[in-house]
From Swiss-Prot:
Identification of the protein by name: Sulfur carrier protein TusA
GO biological process entries: tRNA wobble position uridine thiolation
Active site (catalytic residues): C19 (cysteine persulfide intermediate)
Superkingdom, taxonomy of origin: Bacteria
Subcellular location: Cytoplasm
Species of origin: Shewanella sp. (strain ANA-3)
InterPro entries in the cross-refs: Sulphur_carrier_TusA, TusA-like, TusA-like_sf
Stated role: Sulfur carrier protein which probably makes part of a sulfur-relay system.
Keywords, alphabetical: Cytoplasm
Family according to the record: Belongs to the sulfur carrier protein TusA family.
Amino acid sequence: MNDVFSTAQHKLDALGLRCPEPVMMVRKTVRQMAQGETLLIIADDPATTRDIPSFCEFMDHTLVASETSQTPYQYLIKKGL
């Protein structure tokens, strides 16, 4: 599964940040991306396991992959509309 994470066009390091900072940074980064581009998010805040999937659903982005069995957590999202 790690191979899918290496395909990301953008990367966001949110290690050490706590809610709501990771999602705020994701939102800011995604705004600068083109539709269809991908973003790898690396985080260690347990709240991201809930917040990032919810953000994707709410904002019509696709959560392509996630690895949350151990820290650091990894999320790969694809920008939607």
